[in-house]
Amino acid sequence: MGIFDKLKDVNEMRKQAKQIELQLANETVSGSSSGGKIKITMDGNQAIKSVEVDAAVAGDKSEVARHIRSALEDLFKHHKKMLQSKFGNMMQ
Protein backbone atom coordinates (compact mmCIF):
# COMPACT_ATOMS: atom_id res chain seq x y z
CA MET A 1 0.00 0.00 0.00
CA GLY A 2 1.52 3.28 -1.11
CA ILE A 3 1.47 6.59 0.69
CA PHE A 4 -1.35 7.93 -1.50
CA ASP A 5 -3.52 4.95 -0.62
CA LYS A 6 -2.87 5.60 3.07
CA LEU A 7 -3.81 9.28 2.66
CA LYS A 8 -7.00 8.23 0.90
CA ASP A 9 -7.83 5.93 3.83
CA VAL A 10 -7.18 8.74 6.33
CA ASN A 11 -9.45 11.10 4.43
CA GLU A 12 -12.18 8.45 4.33
CA MET A 13 -11.87 7.93 8.08
CA ARG A 14 -12.18 11.69 8.64
CA LYS A 15 -15.36 11.76 6.56
CA GLN A 16 -16.81 8.87 8.55
CA ALA A 17 -15.88 10.53 11.84
CA LYS A 18 -17.59 13.76 10.77
CA GLN A 19 -20.73 11.82 9.77
CA ILE A 20 -20.81 10.09 13.16
CA GLU A 21 -20.34 13.43 14.93
CA LEU A 22 -23.29 14.90 13.02
CA GLN A 23 -25.45 11.86 13.80
CA LEU A 24 -24.61 12.08 17.48
CA ALA A 25 -25.41 15.80 17.59
CA ASN A 26 -29.00 14.89 16.68
CA GLU A 27 -29.34 12.30 19.45
CA THR A 28 -30.32 13.21 23.01
CA VAL A 29 -30.14 11.16 26.16
CA SER A 30 -31.32 11.98 29.67
CA GLY A 31 -30.47 10.73 33.10
CA SER A 32 -32.15 11.40 36.39
CA SER A 33 -31.42 10.81 40.03
CA SER A 34 -33.44 8.37 42.05
CA GLY A 35 -36.76 10.01 42.66
CA GLY A 36 -36.23 12.28 39.66
CA LYS A 37 -35.07 15.24 41.77
CA ILE A 38 -32.43 16.16 39.18
CA LYS A 39 -32.58 15.48 35.44
CA ILE A 40 -29.69 16.09 33.04
CA THR A 41 -29.99 15.96 29.25
CA MET A 42 -27.12 15.94 26.75
CA ASP A 43 -26.61 15.27 23.08
CA GLY A 44 -24.75 12.30 21.69
CA ASN A 45 -21.52 14.31 21.61
CA GLN A 46 -21.80 14.77 25.39
CA ALA A 47 -22.75 18.46 25.26
CA ILE A 48 -25.07 19.23 28.18
CA LYS A 49 -28.37 20.62 26.90
CA SER A 50 -30.32 21.05 30.14
CA VAL A 51 -30.23 20.52 33.88
CA GLU A 52 -33.47 20.45 35.85
CA VAL A 53 -33.43 20.67 39.66
CA ASP A 54 -36.47 20.00 41.82
CA ALA A 55 -37.01 22.90 44.22
CA ALA A 56 -37.32 20.39 47.08
CA VAL A 57 -33.55 19.69 47.02
CA ALA A 58 -32.30 23.11 45.93
CA GLY A 59 -31.39 24.31 49.43
CA ASP A 60 -29.42 21.28 50.60
CA LYS A 61 -25.92 21.20 49.07
CA SER A 62 -25.09 17.64 50.05
CA GLU A 63 -28.42 16.34 48.74
CA VAL A 64 -27.98 18.26 45.47
CA ALA A 65 -24.49 16.80 45.07
CA ARG A 66 -25.78 13.27 45.74
CA HIS A 67 -28.59 13.71 43.22
CA ILE A 68 -26.23 15.19 40.59
CA ARG A 69 -23.92 12.21 40.93
CA SER A 70 -26.84 9.80 40.61
CA ALA A 71 -28.23 11.66 37.58
CA LEU A 72 -24.83 11.68 35.86
CA GLU A 73 -24.33 7.96 36.44
CA ASP A 74 -27.77 7.31 34.95
CA LEU A 75 -27.08 9.69 32.06
CA PHE A 76 -23.81 8.02 31.06
CA LYS A 77 -25.42 4.58 31.34
CA HIS A 78 -28.09 5.71 28.85
CA HIS A 79 -25.45 7.34 26.64
CA LYS A 80 -23.45 4.11 26.49
CA LYS A 81 -26.58 2.13 25.56
CA MET A 82 -27.40 4.64 22.82
CA LEU A 83 -23.88 4.36 21.38
CA GLN A 84 -24.02 0.58 21.48
CA SER A 85 -27.39 0.50 19.73
CA LYS A 86 -26.30 2.94 17.00
CA PHE A 87 -22.69 1.88 16.51
CA GLY A 88 -22.38 -1.48 18.25
CA ASN A 89 -20.75 -3.14 15.26
CA MET A 90 -18.07 -0.43 15.17
CA MET A 91 -17.31 -0.59 18.92
CA GLN A 92 -16.09 -4.19 19.06
Language-model segment annotations:
Residues 1-30, 71, 77-92:
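Long amphipathic alpha-helical segments used for membrane anchoring, targeting, substrate engagement
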